[in-house]
């Protein structure tokens, strides 16, 4: 275990009063109201939370001083269920009592190797064998890591944060808190040490009133998902003495992710102090208002980057986490106060005394802070990247995030250094291996533990410690956290697992705590870039030193950066970049520490490519929202937690989800010399030259932090990202967060603008990218940074880590997106940066993560078999997922793979959360991208994409070509895309088409999360998608590794010709559209495929959908042109094409649009030419499918998953998809590409038509089924149509049709996964699908397909695929019309009217046969329909479960519809024919698909309602009326439907018609009325009565009176209700005959008023009896008591107390004269005489008694 002590020591130092002042988080300091309010609202700190030390008042929390926040005990954490600002709910956040939390901490830390705060000495005591305690205590690595990093004894206790302190205990166990914060009911502020909790106010002034500043708030803010924040990283092995953070050697899992600390970096007290991560508070501080940071407080700004981003509480939270985590960040901030606070921050649980603890703070503050930073990073918004990274990236991201966090640039540096160290990933893996399942949050601890084990390596890779933490976060999550984050299996659960996400959004480096203003953030971003530039020198030198102990420079930089608040922002700019580039930065951090640090906050220009990319994007977006950098809805807050506060983001069950550690921008990250790793580079943001690597490493850092030998000779920022230095999940996570928080469209555009549109940001981004690119990728220009992001993402995708990273991103993004409502705007910029950054890391991870993720994969393999096999194994072996054929789609798939592979294992736990996340992102972003935003996105994308593409190509070629570069690229792209999903539609599009796919996936994942119907299935689908992407990439790599023409080569010559011709036909429009649609499709496909794979456990499906996706992609691109996307992004399309050329396998990496546009062609060609091989690969990857159809199946399924896998709502589609997939399994070879494309189109279409998804989806589903049914001949037609439309069509062989059918069913099955979140994309997909399948029917055909996929599916089953729909020809135009109306209208709404109309026009061209029969397009349609139906129905199981939707959505054409012979000469329609013949299904089909006008009249003027009424089809009549049939429709002779019903004596229909307002008074033109048409007495009587009621009747006319009966009329006389007189109540004399009095009801009559009778119990022996007052009787009889007693001695007289009498009477149910009681005193003790009421007395009183017998009406009188 790493000695977390130094880092945590820093954290604690950070917490001390001095640090508090430095952070500018003084209690008196008030955080901007806007931030505070938003954060407060989000945080919703619950005072009732049992905080042992400090409960933060919600209002107070907002005002809480940064240090005060830090001082809060973890138990002061927000109660579970508390929502963190930015709408981040950290379910993992559990209220953890001081004691309870500590107890929980050890248990949760068992995996983390951290002991609860209560047991400082047991700091590393995890429940698992990996317990850090064992490491710390015994000095032996708990996880087999040699060299527990012992900090000095003092450090150990004071500097090392306990698991609780780190928030790890909760994350580790995830049992205690519903928020998945294992072990802790409350999130203990990472910086808060148990000692600190107990610390005297004098020592820790800010701790003085922890209750005041409820740590709860901060803890809630703290990313509790930072599983990678293993306390062991900061383990206070050395109880006293100087704290050292030892990172395992680079050869360990995350060598490239060096910790901020140098090898046994010695954090000087001042350094630690300075490095104290304000973000530790910032994790809580992520709510700036919480930290009480003032805009003017530069320190606060660094410390609480999130503070600037109040509207993104979540983002803020992430930011806070980032900032808080890196002690260096604190160092960057105010130097002297920080050091103390920082050291304090890492409060070392082991510290025996507060003084010792305090003492260690300054010394270890940076190191522990850094270490802690990493784990917290895991919990941060960078979790998304972390998630995908699944350990490697998580670490990188952890570091990156933390470093990014404005508050803790120093920390940031630490994180990056750690990432550079890269050793932590291995530790992380090891940790994961041990506690994958049961230590979701404990992953961080485990990472730390692993780090501890790798003491030497950790020492060497002190910077790696942070990374380790991240890696651990990413990996340790496996067991329990995977469930939490099933969507993003690889990721830490933090980002994906929303409930636990403290800071889902990559913590934007909105570090400037002072100003939460958006513009400030924007400035912050720009400033960040500047800060990077001007602060980087310090940052670099300070990075290592800061990590190691040098924080003077860092502090200075931090001070300068944060002093202005803007500088802090500037510092956060890297952080923001890191946040937006969270994933990328993280990866870069893994690859290059600089990236990592930068990643947390806004994307920094400095971070090689990611940093730069994100920086501009982050900067631009940052101004938009509070802090766009925190796109994830989580501030890029690096959580600076004391070792004792193992603060792990509960929402990051994935090991890759990292809690970003914000490092002040001022911090200079100098290359850290990691032992065995070579120089570790701090985050570019921290680098003086503004590049990822230090000057000496700028051009080609050899990834001194343990780049694997397989890695390229140089490491760019993207390489770093790819290497896991920057966790892609962290980067993409932000974008997703943005999507959720802010409108996806807005987010997309925000990203776009933030990153591209903003000239300053762009220039800054370019500069940063150039610098970092120059440093990292000397050959890659500024744009290359962006593109390399994609490209590297693609490359990284090959790496397990990257995939995992993106999976986390997906989940985190989903989480973020859901919770990013407030932080959305702020997240936008970061998302952009992160997406790009995420993309970058993708490629690099292929190289570095190959090794790192090999170990990570091993670790993650424990976490997730899927991840291990797919993500990690692919990184190492890629054969499983390298589908040469699918490689074209692999770009998208890769990114999807990264997301989905990771997501599935996490998704299992999280269910549809991850997919939903992705979906959400896809939904919104794709919408802008495909519809309105698509052109802008494309335009924005092209410039960057173009250059970036080329650069990416180079990077891919260098990094990825050697191995499964394409696969890696695609996976990286996938991963990057996951991260970039949000910005994919906007700025992300330019960067990477796979980004868009990821965005779509994010939307889809989000939809899944929202729908949660596909929770696991969605995760499976996503996983399958990712696996398929990987297979596809492998295929590509195998066949055409990383070549421009690889995709082209993948397609068979015919397909290529066809596709080429199609594209040539529509060179720009089609290409761009194709790119857009393909991007969306690819995104959705990949994501969906992953989901589908999980759902169906059919990697084949995944592959098949991918193939299908690719095959269909060209058509998809063409439909987009119809959509109008074509026109806008023509150049982007060209760029996309070029990008595609640049990186055949990294197509997605390079540009989602281009890849999407060309990938389909390539995929088709590839599949045609290499169909067998892809199938083989698919078979390898998916064990459940046939080899030959496997590819097609997988392609179809992938498309289905992409389209529907992310739509949990469409169960019915899912079933259809399943069925189709089964069908397609047999015929999978021919049409995988096309079907994939169709499905892609559907996926894109839902994105485009998010609003009209329900209708469109339903219709496309039917159309799909229909097309499916007619796939054989339709295929041929499709070929021609595709060619005509410029849609690359496969051979159109029957197998493809069959495959399409199968795939369609598979799609339908999987579509539910993706549909909910990709409705808009679904529409696009539909459009594309129609283009793919019904090439001619561009707009409506797709809609028709949407309407008829089920039909086609059914038809495919019932009718020969090649059979023409001659009889249903009339239906096809109508169906098209219907589709156009439903989906087309929707398209119109979504600015796709053109496409809709166009599609409609084209649909008629193919004719009904074509529309119904194209199997290839139909299979996408069913998939699309599933997509559409899923969102609406959310019925994953029932493909046609949406009967109501069937009305709105397309229903598959019933076989009868084709068999019906319609007499068109008579003007008859299929609807009329079906209504006449009673074919209800056909009628419904026609109605739902609007095949025919419900009121269409034949030549005689008869409509369908006439026909149904005349023939008595009640149900059909009802359907017709429900669909708006004119109840009084008149034929030419004036006959109304009512007349037909009466004439034919259909009484029920008459009733129904009358209920619908039929006019019974209307007569035919010949004068016949309904009364003259009756043929039965019943009808006549009914009509007579009805008319009488209408017209009224005379009062004396009773003939027509209606009789109304009660329910008794329905009962037999002998079984009537209970007869009251049958068994009257009362005592029965057993001596008397039964019938004497048993059935008598007694009535008493008297001439005078009866005396009141009282039912009283006078003795215990007897029950209550009837009594009269003796006084009343005497009055009545006018005699005295004595005379009465003597005359009637037989009458019983008793005496009772008045009070008792009153009590009994008043409570008697038989007493009904309350007025009689008024004369009695309830409290009187006087005695009352009572006389028993008997017949004799009654007679005496002159009353007559009657007994009424039920059977005898006679009565006897007794006197």
Curated annotation (Swiss-Prot):
Pfam families: Ank_2, BCOR, PUFD. GO terms for molecular function: DNA-binding transcription factor binding; heat shock protein binding; histone deacetylase binding; RNA polymerase II transcription regulatory region sequence-specific DNA binding; transcription corepressor activity; ubiquitin-protein transferase activity. Residues 498-514 are annotated as: Interaction with BCL6. The modification Phosphothreonine is found at residue 1128. Residues 552-580, 1426-1439 have a biased composition (Low complexity). The lineage of its organism: Eukaryota, Metazoa, Chordata, Craniata, Vertebrata. The keyword Secreted does not apply. This is BCL-6 corepressor. Expressed in heart, liver, lung, skeletal muscle, spleen and testis. Its main location: nucleus. GO terms for biological process: blastocyst hatching; chromatin remodeling; heart development; negative regulation of bone mineralization; negative regulation of tooth mineralization; negative regulation of transcription by RNA polymerase II; odontogenesis; roof of mouth development. Residues 1638-1752 are annotated as: Necessary and sufficient for interaction with PCGF1. Residues 739-767, 776-786, 1081-1111, 1169-1178, 1256-1282 have a biased composition (Basic and acidic residues). ANK repeats lie at residues 1466-1499, 1500-1529, 1533-1562. Keywords: Acetylation, ANK repeat, Chromatin regulator, Isopeptide bond, Nucleus, Phosphoprotein, Repeat, Repressor, Transcription, Transcription regulation, Ubl conjugation. The gene is Bcor. Belongs to the BCOR family.
